[in-house]
Regions:
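Short terminal interaction segments
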Residues: 1-15, 100-140
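Short terminal alpha-helical segments
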Residues: 19-38
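Amphipathic, charged alpha-helical scaffolds that flank and support histidine-based chemistry
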Residues: 87-103
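Short, solvent-exposed, charged loop/turn and helix-capping segments
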Residues: 58-76
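Long, amphipathic, charge-rich alpha-helical segments that form helical bundles/coiled-coils
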Residues: 73-90
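Solenoid-repeat scaffolds in large eukaryotic assemblies
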Residues: 48, 55, 99-102
Length: 140
């Protein structure tokens, strides 16, 4: 993942609420999927393995944030684990079909979380962060 993209994710995370945070985590997953594809196309097997591990770490973060007191969390857990297994299969078979399957599932979930995030009017999670306006920062 490029440094500029990392900075963008950091900025977005510093200003998001809880609903937006999940969307940003999904965006990070998709950035790693792009890294997987790029490494595969260039024949960089080690880079591909690293990108797959990074994508799996994002899935681990999503799994860790599940609240199992809600029934939907059990379904999300199964989907996230399936995606992790597909990424593992892609790593060991050196093919992209498992990556594509995981990306497809995650994209369908992503569209739902985007809609939920639009309805979330809660306050930002981080306090005392700088506000960014068109590339300029202003202290609160």
């Amino acid at each position: 993942m490029e440094n500029e993209l990392k900075k963008d994710f950091t900025r977005r995370l510093s200003q998001c609420n809880s609903g937006e945070m999940i969307v940003i985590i999904y965006d990070i997953f998709f950035a790693y999927v792009d890294d997987i594809r790029q490494a595969h196309c260039t024949g960089d097997h080690d880079g591909q393995k690293d990108a797959i591990r990074n994508a799996q770490s994002v899935l681990d973060e999503l799994i860790g944030s599940l609240n199992f007191s809600y029934p939907i969390s059990h379904n999300l857990y199964k989907l996230y684990m399936f995606c992790k297994n597909e990424l593992s299969r892609a790593m060991y078979e050196n093919r992209l079909d498992g990556v594509q399957e995981a990306e497809h599932i995650m994209h369908r979930l992503y569209t739902s979380f985007v809609e939920v995030a639009k309805q979330d009017k809660s306050a930002p999670l981080m306090k005392n962060t700088q506000q960014v306006y068109a590339g300029m920062t202003y202290a609160r």
